[in-house]
Regions:
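Membrane-interface alpha helices of multi-pass inner-membrane proteins
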Residues: 3-29, 152-159
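Aromatic-anchored segments of alpha-helical transmembrane domains
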Residues: 12, 60-68, 154-163, 191-204
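Helix-to-loop transition at the C-terminal end of transmembrane segments
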Residues: 66-84
């Protein structure tokens, strides 16, 4: 119980920084409920109620303790939605909403982008929440490992989240790295990381497109020159095989 309470404390602290941290509380709670069912023979509904009550107690106690010790009160609540004020092209629901609004303007229907975004973003969140609920109950039934359920649910959440930054994928990658060990997962993570290193500049710099193109072209030219010099040097030295 000490380890369970400690995990709840850490996850609650994480959730006060980023609301997605609270997701872990649900999967830890489901794992605990599964433990009660298998080890103690507790009825499913009773084990579920016990796990929910325990996690809620830990959450409320942690929020009260941290808020009192830091002196910030509940200010962390209002600061959670700051990212939702921007339009992120990486977000599926936002991209669909903006694209639909753009085509609506082309058809002469007026600019209804904000209203469309409200619909698409709400639908995206509902889809993510529904899938997360499915993963929670799959964890309770023992059909998926809690870490795998957390990673899969987080991945779907990132896909349908109203705002997505490149590093949001870490919400899913970190738990999935401890559960998914197939080559396709590793390849996908490497490919995504490599692509984002080109699409998004360090520190979120918003440079003009012409500047970004100049940087990439210069880097490509420098790489081509270095590769050509290396090839010439290897052939002139008579080296056939690199040991």
């Amino acid at each position: 119980y000490l380890a369970l309470a400690a995990s709840g404390f850490c996850l609650s602290c994480a959730g006060m920084v980023k609301v997605t941290g609270f997701i872990g509380l649900g999967f830890v709670g489901m794992a605990y409920a599964r433990y009660l069912i298998e080890k103690n023979g507790t009825p499913r509904w009773k084990a579920l109620a016990c796990a929910i009550a325990l996690q809620l107690v830990v959450l409320v106690a942690t929020v009260a303790l941290i808020s009192a010790c830091t002196g910030i009160g509940l200010g962390w609540v209002t600061g959670q939605g700051g990212a939702a004020s921007i339009r992120s092209w990486l977000s599926t629901s936002t991209a669909v909403g903006v694209g639909t609004g753009f085509f609506g303007m082309l058809l002469g229907l007026g600019d209804h982008t904000e209203a469309i975004l409200t619909v698409t973003r709400t639908f995206g969140v509902l889809v993510a929440v529904a899938f997360m609920a499915r993963m929670l109950f799959a964890t309770l039934r023992g059909r998926i490992h809690p870490v795998g359920g957390l990673g899969t649910a987080s991945l779907v959440l990132v896909i349908f989240f109203p705002v997505v930054h490149p590093w949001y994928i870490l919400w899913a990658v970190l738990p999935l790295a401890a559960w998914a060990n197939r080559l396709i997962f590793r390849f996908s993570v490497v490919a995504y990381s490599a692509a984002m290193s080109f699409f998004v500049l360090p520190r979120g710099l918003g440079l003009p497109p012409s500047t970004i193109i100049a940087i990439y072209v210069s880097a490509a030219c420098a790489y081509a020159v270095i590769a050509a010099l290396w090839w010439v040097a290897v052939h002139r030295s008579g080296i056939r095989v690199l040991d």
